[in-house]
């Protein structure tokens, strides 16, 4: 027992020795630190004295302008890339450089997108200027139905919306997918920007149903439809809002670009015409980006319809354009459509149900408009393009006017092809003789009139030279038909229903003139339409 106490005493004495040694070392460390602190304070005082002598010297005061220029140049250098710095310096001098730097600083504060940067699409100056010059437009609700959206695609989409130069918008995201991270990413953005809204759907109701859920969320006066993997140009909503505010548009659409991989890799630009009903009846050329007023949507029968899944946008656009007061086309590519395997941007034939739905949408459109049609079909080899056979309910006589001067073999080919291929029952041919010299020409005229006494006649123009307008105006005086067809004598009819195809358009009150596609002998196109304006 005594031995145990002695051992404990030895342990305690050993601990006391170590503690005393540690205390001594710490005391030495404190003494060294106090010495270093004293030296540092002395050095600081010396530096302050030296600095005072420098800043108070005449040299320092005389070189202040040079130091100011160097300082500002460093700021500009860090703000602008080298090539921009040199370009602005050469074109606008130091003032141009400063203006460019100011715009870029403002841009950095206004456009937070890190992945899909706004300045990848437009000059910084334009972006900043549009933010400062807000159109008096409506609140625009951008509806995006999400479905297992790849997160990198979603991040680009969100950046492209947040970076809009027009600020009066909201983003309505409805999510019917199961992929992890999608909802979290949108909700994280929504926590920073309350204009972004998210709703998790209980079930997938396909694109039409999911889109309609997003429209239900929307509080804006205008709706814009955005696919979940596509990208908006930063100026898209600004141009649309300007058209709405200044032109009273209730339906707006823009040009677009299709890209693969990175947005810079554009594989197709889709430059569209202004609104053309016949174009829309052939193909949904409107597509993206489209905005329409809520009032117009309600007047046209509501949002998208499930029975047209696959061509739900096409069916909606047909209804909206039937009712719209003012349709405006913005001729700028403001929408970037991502092409991926299986997407309609890549090939609509990948989704045959889209084609069937498109045909059904067209038939419903004609029924609403009171337009009689015999058939609507897909044009072979052109997925997404439809052909309408209108019912010919006003089949008047067609007077075919053919100015001719010798070249009798060409004329024979032309006339014989008309009689060989034409299935339209009521037509006449008027050959307008224009100073022919060859006797064979006149013998051929007599033979043709003898072979076709009921619907072929030859009239002789007394004028000189070749004046196509004057010749046809002269021939028209002898025409008995309701429709006039101007035909060159070196053409050949190759399609049986050629007159039916033109008459079914010409009979419509909104149509004044109809043209047919012309081919060269090697089947290349000679003429396929004329644009005005």
Predicted ranges, named:
Residues 1-136:
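Boundary detector for helix-to-coil junctions that initiate low-complexity/charged tails
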Residues 138-143, 170, 315, 396-401, ...:
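Cell-envelope/extracellular polymer assembly enzymes that use nucleotide-activated donors
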Residues 158-168, 416-426:
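Short, acidic, metal-binding catalytic loop of nucleotide-sugar glycosyltransferases
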Residues 167, 175-184, 203, 227, ...:
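A conserved acidic beta->alpha catalytic loop
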Residues 201-218, 461-479:
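Glycine-rich, basic loop-to-helix element that forms the pyrophosphate-binding segment
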Residues 223, 484:
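Short aromatic/hydrophobic "clamp" motif used to bind/position activated sugar donors
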Residues 231, 235-266, 491-533:
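Conserved donor NDP-sugar-binding/catalytic core segment of glycosyltransferases
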Residues 276-363:
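Conserved nucleotide-sugar donor-binding catalytic segment
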């Amino acid at each position: 027992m005594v031995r145990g106490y002695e051992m404990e005493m030895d342990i305690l004495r050993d601990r006391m020795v170590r503690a005393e040694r540690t205390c001594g070392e710490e005391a030495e460390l404190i003494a060294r630190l106090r010495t270093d602190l004293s030296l540092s304070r002395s050095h600081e005082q010396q530096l302050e004295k030296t600095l005072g002598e420098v800043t108070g010297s005449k040299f320092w005061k005389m070189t202040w302008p040079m130091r100011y220029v160097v300082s500002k140049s460093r700021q500009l250098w860090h703000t602008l890339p080298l090539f921009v710095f040199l370009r602005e310096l050469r074109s606008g001098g130091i003032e141009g450089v400063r203006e460019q730097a100011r715009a870029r600083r403002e841009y950095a504060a206004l456009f937070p997108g890190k992945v899909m940067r706004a300045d990848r699409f437009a000059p910084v100056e334009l972006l900043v200027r549009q933010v400062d010059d807000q159109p008096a437009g409506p609140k625009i609700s951008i509806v995006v139905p999400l479905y297992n959206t790849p997160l990198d695609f979603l991040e680009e989409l969100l950046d492209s919306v947040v970076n809009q130069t027009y600020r009066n918008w909201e983003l309505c995201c409805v999510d019917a997918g199961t992929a992890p991270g999608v909802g979290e990413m949108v909700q994280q953005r929504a926590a920073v920007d309350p204009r972004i809204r998210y709703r998790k759907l209980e079930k997938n109701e396909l694109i039409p149903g999911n889109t309609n859920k997003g429209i239900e969320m929307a509080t804006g006066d205008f709706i814009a439809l955005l696919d979940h993997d596509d990208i908006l140009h930063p100026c898209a909503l600004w141009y649309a809002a300007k058209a709405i505010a200044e032109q009273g548009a209730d339906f707006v659409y823009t040009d677009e670009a299709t890209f693969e991989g990175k947005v810079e890799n554009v594989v197709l630009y889709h430059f569209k015409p202004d609104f053309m009903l016949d174009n829309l009846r052939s193909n949904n050329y409107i597509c993206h980006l489209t905005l329409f007023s809520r009032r117009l949507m309600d007047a046209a029968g509501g949002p998208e319809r499930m029975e047209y899944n696959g061509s739900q946008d096409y069916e909606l656009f047909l209804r909206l354009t039937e009712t719209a007061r003012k349709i405006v086309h913005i001729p700028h590519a403001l929408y970037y459509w991502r092409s991926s395997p299986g997407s309609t941007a890549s090939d609509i034939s990948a989704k045959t149900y889209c084609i069937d739905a498109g045909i059904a949408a067209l038939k419903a459109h004609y029924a609403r408009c009171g337009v009689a049609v015999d058939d609507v079909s897909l044009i072979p080899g052109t997925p997404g393009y439809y052909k309408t056979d209108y019912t010919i309910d006003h089949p008047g006589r067609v007077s075919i006017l053919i100015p001719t001067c010798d070249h009798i073999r060409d004329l024979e080919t032309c006339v014989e092809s008309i009689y060989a291929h034409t299935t339209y029952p009521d037509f006449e041919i008027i050959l307008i003789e224009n100073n022919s010299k060859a006797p064979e020409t006149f013998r051929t005229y007599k033979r043709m009139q003898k072979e076709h006494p009921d619907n072929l006649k030859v009239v002789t123009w007394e004028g000189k030279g070749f004046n196509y307008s004057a010749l046809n105006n002269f021939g028209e005086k002898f025409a008995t038909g309701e429709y006039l067809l101007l035909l060159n004598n070196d053409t050949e009819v190759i399609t049986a229903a050629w007159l039916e195809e033109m008459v079914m358009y010409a009979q419509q009150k909104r149509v004044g003139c109809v043209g047919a596609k012309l081919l060269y002998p090697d089947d290349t196109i000679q003429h396929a339409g004329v644009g005005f304006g």
